[in-house]
Regions:
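Secondary-structure boundary/capping residues
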Residues: 36, 88, 96, 165-166
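Active-site-proximal flexible loops/turns
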Residues: 17, 79, 91, 138-140, ...
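Short, electropositive, low-hydrophobicity segments enriched in small/polar residues
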Residues: 11-13, 88, 96, 139
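Glycine-rich, aromatic-flanked loop segments that form ligand/cofactor-binding clefts
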Residues: 66, 72-108
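Generic structural signal for individual residues within well-ordered alpha-helical segments
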Residues: 46-49, 91, 115, 180
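Metal- or metallocofactor-binding catalytic centers and their adjacent structured scaffolds
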Residues: 2-82
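Metal-dependent enolase-superfamily TIM-barrel catalytic cores that perform enediolate-based chemistry
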Residues: 97-197
Length: 197
């Protein structure tokens, strides 16, 4: 702002250099100098987002949206700083503890090794919620290797035991029929979260 106030924003780290260029080239020209009313920041941001989408209609897609996400989080941070309040209180919540889960990004690991890894995180770091990978990333229905999904869906939950939350991420591997089939396996093994089937 003109008085030196600022807010920090966050965007996806994937190809952040491209998103930063889009922010400066395709978002900033339409938002610089715009006023955000602290009384109704959501409406003002939606107007700004609509303006960017109208002016940059030839460039729809994830990079413009990622840049807008960075702007959105920066504006909320700015409003929180100006009000002297945490952002959570501005959006109707209350600051408090945030539960974390241990997330594995690995698919090149055997189900037994993954189970051992996650059990160590439980025992050494105190995690009580875990997410691991099934399928192959954007795998067109193929597994990382034949039978891995079936094996890991049984092995990891059995090793972790009861009293912990178990989640999986398929990263858009499965088509509808296989996604449903895997979903039933997950349900049978106490896995309660199924991300990007």
């Amino acid at each position: 702002t003109e008085d030196g106030a600022f807010g920090w924003g966050q965007m996806s780290t994937y190809h952040a250099d491209i998103t930063a260029q889009v922010l400066h080239r395709q978002v900033a020209p339409w938002v610089t100098g715009r006023f955000i009313d602290a009384g109704d920041p959501v409406a003002d941001f939606l107007d700004i987002a609509a303006l960017v989408h109208e002016r940059e209609h030839k460039f729809p897609g994830s990079y413009v949206r990622r840049a807008l996400a960075g702007l959105d989080t920066a504006l909320w941070d700015l409003l929180g700083r100006q009000a002297g309040k945490p952002v959570t209180s501005l959006i109707g919540g209350a600051p408090g503890r945030l539960r974390a889960y241990a997330s594995s990004m690995k698919r090149d690991i055997t189900p037994a090794d993954e189970a051992n890894r996650l059990c160590r995180l439980r025992d050494e770091k105190g995690f009580d919620a875990f997410k691991f990978r099934v399928g192959a990333e954007c795998g067109r229905g193929m597994d990382e290797w034949p039978g891995r999904t079936e094996e890991i869906v049984e092995t990891v939950p059995r090793a972790l035991g009861d009293g912990v939350v178990k989640m999986v991420d398929a990263n858009s591997c499965f088509g509808v029929e296989r996604a449903i089939e895997v979903g039933r396996m997950l349900e049978a093994n106490g896995i309660t979260h199924y991300e990007e089937p």
